From Swiss-Prot:
<dbReference type="Pfam" id="PF20868">
    <property type="entry name" value="TX13_rpt"/>
</dbReference>
<dbReference type="InterPro" id="IPR028193">
    <property type="entry name" value="TEX13A-D_N"/>
</dbReference>
<keyword id="KW-0479">Metal-binding</keyword>
<dbReference type="GO" id="GO:0008270">
    <property type="term" value="F:zinc ion binding"/>
</dbReference>
<feature type="region of interest" description="Disordered">
    <location>
        <begin position="431"/>
        <end position="675"/>
    </location>
</feature>
<feature type="compositionally biased region" description="Basic and acidic residues">
    <location>
        <begin position="636"/>
        <end position="646"/>
    </location>
</feature>
<feature type="zinc finger region" description="RanBP2-type">
    <location>
        <begin position="677"/>
        <end position="706"/>
    </location>
</feature>
<feature type="compositionally biased region" description="Basic residues">
    <location>
        <begin position="379"/>
        <end position="392"/>
    </location>
</feature>
<feature type="compositionally biased region" description="Basic and acidic residues">
    <location>
        <begin position="366"/>
        <end position="378"/>
    </location>
</feature>
<keyword id="KW-0863">Zinc-finger</keyword>
<feature type="compositionally biased region" description="Polar residues">
    <location>
        <begin position="403"/>
        <end position="416"/>
    </location>
</feature>
<dbReference type="InterPro" id="IPR049534">
    <property type="entry name" value="TEX13A/C/D_Znf"/>
</dbReference>
<dbReference type="InterPro" id="IPR049367">
    <property type="entry name" value="TX13C/D_rpt"/>
</dbReference>
<dbReference type="InterPro" id="IPR001876">
    <property type="entry name" value="Znf_RanBP2"/>
</dbReference>
<keyword id="KW-0862">Zinc</keyword>
<feature type="region of interest" description="Disordered">
    <location>
        <begin position="300"/>
        <end position="419"/>
    </location>
</feature>
<protein>
    <recommendedName>
        <fullName>Testis-expressed protein 13D</fullName>
    </recommendedName>
</protein>
Amino acid sequence: MAMNFGDHASGFRHNDVIRFINNEVLMDGSGPAFYVAFRSRPWNEVEDSLQAIVADSQVPRAIKRACTWSALALSVRVATRQREELLHHVRRLQRHAEERQATSWALTSQLQQLRLEHEVAATQLHLAQAALQQALNERDGLYGRLLQIERFPQAAPLAHEIMSGPQAEQNGAAACPLATEQQSDMVAMGTHANAQMPTPTDVLYVPGPLSPWAQGMQPPLPVPHPFPHPPPFPMKFPSLPPLPPAVVTGAEAAAVPLQMPPTEIHPPCPWPAVGFQEEMAPLWYQRSYIQEEDSKILQGSFPLGDSRSHSQGEGSERSQRMPLPGDSGCHNPLSESPQGTAPLGSSGCHSQEEGTEGPQGMDPLGNRERQNQKEGPKRARRMHTLVFRRSHKSEGPEGPQGTVPQGDSRSYSQEGCSDRAQEMATLVFIRRCKPEGPKRPQWTVPLGDSRSHIKEEGPEGPQRIVLQGDNRSYSQEGSPERAQGMATLVFSRSCKPEEGPERPQDTPLGDSRSHIKEEGPEGPQRIVLQGDNRSYSQEGSPERAQGMATLVFSRSCKPEEGPERPQDTPLGDSRSHIKEEGPEGPQRIVLQGDNRSYSQEGSRERAQGMATLVFSRSCKPEEGPERPQGTPLGDSRSHGVRESPKKWQPQRQKAKKPKVNKVSGSQQQEKPASFPVPVNWKCPWCKAINFSWRTACYKCKKACVPFESGGQTQ
């Protein structure tokens, strides 16, 4: 048989078909030889063999028929085999596709991971670039500073050439800092206090400890110039390397050549006393020029600060001049034995003092220009108490003092007095100020951006005081006896002046511009308090005037005064114009505010003025007999005129409120018989307190008029 029934490779699924084909093959007589011979051959070979048998004419028809049925069965078998091969190939392709798809998924996830890593790397790269740029910038800045520091010593010859000429012409002295081990030489020079030295060769310099902030900052190149008033240098930043001072003694000292210091920065520090006048010579980029004519012993020490000071001394005995740390320019011609000291601050001081024995002057903090002329036969002493002092107490029978404290002030003072003048100013944050002494006039120009021009002429002791603020004051005082002025400035706890007889005192405060002329044989007084004031005062009084002003934020103010001293206290932002004329006690006080006051005072004996300003806790004036007191409070502009003999009493007040003028520039004058005293009075029936301008009690409606300040009625 040609085909087997169980052979699935034959391509036939039905046995009947297989049986029929086998019978046909066997019936023709050819047998299964052709089917078996081409079972495993491809279809092409089967077809070629069948074509050869059919084409052969010698092969009987029955054999041709049997070979044809065998070829048909082989064709089905070949088709089945090819199908199986195709299925196998399809399965294999499917497996390959699945494998490729899995590979693509893996590559996709890997690609996403690579993208994330790329973004992180890019961010890190940007950060690294920013840090690198910052480091490069810092490197460039530090390199620039290093180059500046390296180039800085090259500027020393240029500065020397610029400064050597003016110093040689003016017999001045400027020096470079010495090493630390040479400080002992400077301190040792104090032993030669009373000896006259010609041109000194030792140069004084005391370097302070280097601050870390000063080391970090780069110093700018110095630009030296010989002008006397340079702009102030900021204290919060490291300044130019200082050109430290040198002590020059002798009537005609030769100029010391200028030398530039090393590249260190020397901040301000405490300095030892040098010389026979106990003067300190700190550092602060300064230039000093001193001209001395007809003087025996002169010592000039110029301290810290971008200051330029010019001092001329004329006299026969001893002159001394020392400006302390600050940006100051000072011109001081002295005669005989004056002593001048200009402490801390950016100030320009022009002082001329002429006397016969021994005046002393010292100009403290502030950018100010001051011209002071003192003419008198005896001794004048000027002393300055600097910032943050707790208390200041000046005592002495014959020691005039002059004080010009902190502030951007320009004051011009001429003082001509014969006995004693004492000037004292206790500056900011002072707890207490108490001047005592029988015959001590004072002259005080304290804190503030003030410009005051003062002329004091008289045989004994005039006084003129202009306190805090942008003040411009012009004062002429001519009085023969004694004047005392005391000013306790801002944030002072208490101010208690205790004064004996014949001590006039006046204290102007605030941002004021005052013009004062005081003329009289004994003791005029003029006070202009805080505020943007412009006051013009002329005072002619023969004997004594006393004025005391305790400024803003003071806890208490208690003046204690002798007899026959009138007192007047206007408070607030006021514009007052007061003329006081009388034979005994003139006084003129203009307190805080934008004041413009014009005062003329002519009185002969004693006047006392007390002003307790805004924000004071308590004000308790205690006065002896024959001392009237007036205290107008608030934001007021008061205008008053008083003319009185030794004592005066408040007049009967009308049922009218005192005129309060809120416009500047107006004036009010009253006769001596009609001077009002605004004092509250107490009703004798209902004990209610009424204002001074009321004629009837507001509570019980009963008419009564006060006659004195103690609250009694008539």
